[in-house]
Amino acid sequence: MTTTQLNSPQMSDTSLSSAEEKQGSLSAIKLQLEAQLHAQLQAQLQAQLQEWLGPKGVTFSGETFIVPETHDMVKTLFDPTLHKSNFELIILACLFANLVVFAIPLNQVRTLVFIGLYVFWRLSYNFGIGYLLQQQSLHNRLVDWAKEGKLFDEKNKLFWAQFVQHEVKSQRGKDYAINSLPIEFNTWLVFRKFVDLILMSDFITFCCVVYTCAVENASDFTNHWLVWSRVLTGIGLILFNLWVKVNAHNTIKDYAWYWGDFFFRQINNEELIFDGVFEMVPHPMYSVGYVGYYGFALIAKSYTVLAIAIFGHFLQMIFLHYIENPHIDKIYGPSKNEINLIKILKLKDLKSFDNMPPLVGLYNFNWMRSSDLLNLLLVATYAVILPLFSQSTTQYFALTVTTKLIESFGISTLLVLQSYSKYFTKWCLSNDIPVEKSLNNWAVMYNTLINLTYSSLFGLNLMYFLRGSADLLYHDLLYLRIFIGTLLIFTQTWINASIIDLIGYFGWFYGDFFIPKSQSFANHLTKAGVYRYLNNPEQIFGVCGVMGVFIIWPTFENLTCCVLWVLSNFIRINFIEKWHMIRLYGEQEVNQDSGVTKTFKKHLIPEVIQRKISGDEPLRRRPSSPSLADSLDTFIKELTNSKTKLSQQKLVELSQNLSFANSNYKLTIEGLKYNDLKTAKFATLGSPLKVIWQSPLATHSSKDWIGLYRIINTTYSRNRTILSSAGRWTYCPDANGSYVFARNKLFWEEGVYEFRYHLDGKHDVAYISEPFELKHESVSVPLHDDEVEVFALALKEKIFDRLLDIESTTVPIAQVATSQTDNVLATYQLLSSVISTSTKVQISSKIFLKSDQITILDVARKLYDINKVLDELSYDLSIKKDE
């Protein structure tokens, strides 16, 4: 190359242009990095500022504010360093006034007085606090009363207004400006004192009842091992109760402790908290939060205290059911789309049971079902008739044990054979029984054997009770035994009902053993409800009712039955069901730590040992790191909550915790229909679906896209889609627009589906449409030859036109299929599948391969011929034949 060529103007311009491009690229990268760093610093500053100022609250009228720090009940009342308000002084006076009762000389009278006081305060809890909270939840009544009475208006000089304002200022300090915070917060402050009065008085009067009853039974406190075991057990229950209360308060703080979400919402408390003791048991404040009461009863050795504890605990559960739970469902419950999805899945759950709820025990009994009548006769025979007429209790005990052994060995053996070799399914198919029917047949057999075992156990105890010939292993504490035994029986019933509600009849009857995973409705094990706290709740609580029977009637026979039930249940769950679930869902999902295990590790195992244990686990057992979906979810929430005022509609949606409810994105589907019950929407297979999208113009990207997905494959995340759309997607070039999904853009399988709006060519989800079901179009096969052409037109319109552009019913299908599709065999298989399901006449894809000249009219005539043969082979049992 010459010097002239090296120094040519063209080469110089090219080099200069290249350098400028590199410089521009570096500048763009620098600006991008600076923007990212600025955003990160801003987010950190906002987080630190929010932590310093306190949590952010929003009233139900849309006003936002910083929630000030408050103190718990015990610290407020009994910490001498804190200033006491007027209400707090009144509360302390009421508590110390209980000492006046001890001036009564007779201890029995003191006990009656304290019982009366406890009943008064306990009823005040239910009908005082409960009534006020219900009115506040439904009608915002307390806040309205405060507004109507102008209680927080500094211009109001009425006594009650001045008294309430002085009370609030005495709580928050003299410099507290009442109008600086919403009236909802001030009303909550006053309501807290009413709660403090009732709760503290309730507990103090109960302690006084315990003391007076313990004094009455002072002679029972002798130096004996049984006394010490009773006292130590009671102290253990009380200490556990104390830990539950402290842990619960540390987890949910004053906001939830004093029902703050009845008055306003905290931005960072938009979902229920499952941490600490809340991860260990459901509703710990109402369930295990009262075990200390039974500990007091043990220490006092008083049935009076036990009855009072049961009375208080029962009223607390009533409060939970009628006051707390409805508000929880209102604020934190599922969205409308989720409710519709649950309804659809529950209806789908009955598909394997002839679309009727199957018999569980004697629940769902149907007089028109022969298997139900048979179960009723067997239960009556084993539970009542045989015990009344049997002459030998020993023989009936042998019958009970034999029945349980047959049930245990038979059910377990069939489950093992089904798990490893699909024995039961193969038998059903060999006898021309569809796979869907196999689960129903199994359910009838399984439930019948279970009914036989429990009815025989009931009959055995009925026989001993009527004859009074049983030798009890323990005779004392009859009423305590009855209470504990009844509680265990009730617990087993409740646990079983909860399990069925969560996993459906499909899961209750081991549907995973009989129905292929691809046809089931969930690809993941549930971790909701009772399964949030225990991986296998039925392992203990599934047989605790039998333990309760033994406690009530402690005989050798009941002890033997109890051991049999526990061993059978343990073996079936741990050595059959668990291993099948591992093969089906994977070891990582099956062996996840339950809530109880997590709490146990957190509080009882040192952190060093925990790190050692987690370090020894295989990589596949370690939890995955947080995904970017959480960042997107937080981003959308921050956009919504950044305003100082929220619209009424957005506020309602926020209070109901609707997924994507506050998003500026929206998807609307045209072409859906309501089912007969008006409970869910559906479309027929192949019907075009028009999707209309709306997105904010400022943030819209031409790479935004919409995809169609099966819900059972995307339930793992509502904020990010990892599953491929398999071509069922389209770009959204404009901020607002529509697109018609048809043919290969649709799924051709029945199921529940949804559309997802994704951002900027990525898989971050901005909006999810309402769930809808795809169903097969029903096409009736004619009974007469002259209706075949009409039938062919129906096939063309409802099936063929949705896959191929065929001009008429006499055009060869192969001619069109080969020119319009890339995979002819797949098209033929899809056509045969849809036709078979829609007409309920099974045909094979080979029908299209036998001749290249076959037309839609030929297919219609073939279906007519098959149906005619099947109709001739069948007959109507309701029509009597001529003899």
From Swiss-Prot:
Membrane topology qualifier: Multi-pass membrane protein
Pfam families xrefs: PEMT (PF04191)
Domain of life where this protein originates: Eukaryota
Xref: PROSITE patterns: S5A_REDUCTASE, SAM_CHO2
Stretches assigned to the Cytoplasmic side: 107-111, 215-223, 301-302, 394-396, 463-469, 561-883
Membrane-crossing segments per the record: 86-106, 112-132, 194-214, 224-244, 280-300, 303-323, 373-393, 397-417, 442-462, 470-490, 540-560
Record keywords: Endoplasmic reticulum, Lipid biosynthesis, Lipid metabolism, Membrane, Methyltransferase, Phospholipid biosynthesis, Phospholipid metabolism, S-adenosyl-L-methionine, Transferase, Transmembrane, Transmembrane helix
Enzyme class: transferase
GO biological processes: methylation; phosphatidylcholine biosynthetic process
Subcellular location: Endoplasmic reticulum membrane
Protein EC: 2.1.1.17
GO cellular component: endoplasmic reticulum membrane
Record bears the keyword Lipid metabolism: yes
Reaction(s) catalysed by this chain's protein: a 1,2-diacyl-sn-glycero-3-phosphoethanolamine + S-adenosyl-L-methionine = a 1,2-diacyl-sn-glycero-3-phospho-N-methylethanolamine + S-adenosyl-L-homocysteine + H(+)
InterPro entries registered for this protein in UniProt: Phopholipid_MeTrfase, Phosphatid-EA_MeTrfase_fun
Pathway as given in its UniProt record: Phospholipid metabolism; phosphatidylcholine biosynthesis
GO molecular function, one term: phosphatidylethanolamine N-methyltransferase activity
Lumenal side, ranges: 1-85, 133-193, 245-279, 324-372, 418-441, 491-539
Family statement: Belongs to the class VI-like SAM-binding methyltransferase superfamily. CHO2 family.
Function: Catalyzes the first step of the methylation pathway of phosphatidylcholine biosynthesis, the SAM-dependent methylation of phosphatidylethanolamine (PE) to phosphatidylmonomethylethanolamine (PMME).
Protein name per UniProt: Phosphatidylethanolamine N-methyltransferase
Naturally occurring in which organism (per UniProt): Lodderomyces elongisporus (strain ATCC 11503 / CBS 2605 / JCM 1781 / NBRC 1676 / NRRL YB-4239) (Yeast)
Gene symbol of the encoding locus: CHO2
